[in-house]
Amino acid sequence: MASRMQQPLYILAEGTNRTHGRSAQDSNIRAGKAVAEAVRTTLGPRGMDKMLVDSSGEVVITNDGATILEKMDIEHPAAQMLVEVSQTQEEEVGDGTTTAAVLTGELLAHAEDLLDDDLHPTVIVEGYTEAARIAQDAIDDMVLDVTLDDDLLRKVAESSMTGKGTGDVTADVLAKHVVKAVQMVHEDDNGVFHRDDVRVLTRTGASSSATELVEGVVLDKEPVNENMPRSVSDATVAVLDMKLDVRKSEVDTEYNITSVDQLTAAIDAEDSELRGYAKALADAGVDVVFCTKSIDDRVAGFLADAGILAFKSVKKSDARALARATGAKRLGSLSDLDESDLGRVDAVSIRSFGDDDLAFVEGGAAARAVTLFLRGGTEHVVDELERAIEDAVDVVVAAIDKGGVVPGAGATEIAIADRIRSEAAGIEGRKQLAVEAYADAVEALPRTLAENTGMDPIDALVDLRARYETEGLAGIISSGRSGEIGDPVELGVIDPVAVKREAIESATEAATMIVRIDDVIAAK
């Protein structure tokens, strides 16, 4: 009987790898810390760039945390959680991805120390959760009582772009474009902002200082017929979700043609149908046609004869933008075409950039779409410039729509850490250790900023604490050959409150989830 009880019992498939207990926790924590360490040096206005080369040899040079983590070939499941943290931060508020990843790594590092001190994972989770609540309260108190005018929003956009690759055009110039773009389309009649109304298009072949804001839509399209006009002023526009082609029946049909007259009649019938498309558009006074589907070459010829400029295979997203910019309805049929179905624009023109033609649709009657047309000498420059602009647009929108702004440059994090330590004194038991550890983790963000700026991180942190105690506000300001301690609000370093909130929330959720895992079962 005893021998039967000692026989091993296998419940997992052969080849399954299982790690449990402290070994599982150590593995997960190390993986999370490694990911955070990979992006730590990119934090702040003087953060470094990373060069990422994929298996096909494609090179990406960036200091954008979300892009770095997305391009890294990460397999460890715990490490992938940090990638998800970064992605969530990017999707929700558009910036602060590196902050969220670094904070998650710091929370895991301090959790590792607490586990070494025999704190139970549940106690750590409770402490971190309580500290995150205190942090959110501290953020509430740091919200600036200011009017979100264009000047302040430019500072928000500029803070987001400072330190990112913007070529030879300065962040303040780009920030003006970004704020103007957002303000032009921010609210429609229902008070809802459509992010797709601010579009970004890039082209190499010129200095980044040639970047411009187009009040309308720019399409990577050329006319369907070379005889069409290259520009149209005061244009009436039709946006079509249909084929301008011979209609096909829903069932397969065969025609038995036995004579030349029958063949000629069939061809004439097709031509009549195709010519009818062009006639319907011309009779309605249409000057420009944007079609999401195909346009038969014969229809293109008829449209050219009528002096109508036309584009085919327009993306659905472009069609939506065109409809919002021009006031046109997206039509699935030309029957009963009415003037109210059409849109208006000041001008549609074709411009050449190297071997490419782009269509500029400017001055739409509805004025609900703008395009930031970015230029740069190389693909690497315009790609990084595009990422910087996208983030800047998102943070400006976040500042307007999601609770205002707070001081940047690590000042808010210093205030958060101070508040957590103050309230930790009133927490009983070992949970207090976890709450205090959370404060240390948050404080690692301004410490990292100082280090990346060229300051001594320990001295900078001591000075920050001292200035905060005496003046109530202090941050790491990049200036000269290194940095200095200063008032971030006075110097225009401002962040959306939503960026701070989301970083605290997502980092806490990821760290506590990883700490609670004590068993990893990996199938072969």
Curated annotation (Swiss-Prot):
Q: What induces it?
A: By heat shock (at protein level).
Domain of life where this protein originates: Archaea
For this protein, the record's PROSITE patterns field holds:
TCP1_1, TCP1_2, TCP1_3
Keyword Nucleotide-binding carried by entry: yes
Kindly state the subunit structure of this protein.
Answer: The thermosome or CCT complex is a oligomeric complex of two octameric double-ring structures; the complex is probably a heterooligomer of CCT1, CCT2 and CCT3 with yet unknown stoichiometry.
NCBIfam families associated with the record = thermosome_alpha, thermosome_arch, thermosome_beta
Query: Per its database record, what is this protein's job?
Result: Molecular chaperone that assists in the folding or refolding of nascent or denatured proteins along with ATP hydrolysis. ATPase activity is highest in thermosome assemblies containing CCT1:CCT2, followed by assemblies containing CCT1:CCT2:CCT3. Not required for thermosome ATPase activity. Not required for growth.
Q: Please share what else the UniProt entry notes about this protein.
A: Cannot be stably overexpressed.
**Family the UniProt entry places it in:** Belongs to the TCP-1 chaperonin family.
Identify this protein by name.
Answer: Thermosome subunit 3
User: Which species?
Assistant: Haloferax volcanii (strain ATCC 29605 / DSM 3757 / JCM 8879 / NBRC 14742 / NCIMB 2012 / VKM B-1768 / DS2)
